[in-house]
C-alpha cells in the first residue's frame, strides 16, 4: 500500500522533531496512538508529545518551547488548497513567532497542511501522509544544507 511505501522510503531518514498543533486555544496536539501521530512516525518524524496519555492532549506553551521542535505543523480549517505549504505568517503560528529561539521559528519550518487530507479520516489520509512526508523531507534537506 501507499503507507507501506512511505514508511519504507523514510525508514532510515534522519528523524525530525515535530510539534503537531491541532488547536490554538486551548493548545492541543496528538500522541503517537492518534492517526496523525502514526503518520508522523511513518514519515520519520519524532512527535515531541508522543508519550502523553490522551489521544489529543492539551499542552502548555512552555512545554512546546522546552521541547524545541524542529518543525511545527498544523492543518487548515478550510480544505481544498495545496496539500501543504510553508506558512510562517499564518495566524496559527502567531504564538510561536514570539519564540524566536525555537528551531522551528528560527528556520521558518512552520507548515500548514490541507485539513481535508489530514484531519478527516478516510482514503485521502494517504495523501495527507504524503504531504507530511514532503514537509519533513524539506526540513531534512534544509537542515543538511546548514
Where are these regions (language model features)?
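Binding-cleft/active-site segments that stabilize strongly anionic ligands or cofactors
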Residues: 2-126, 134-145
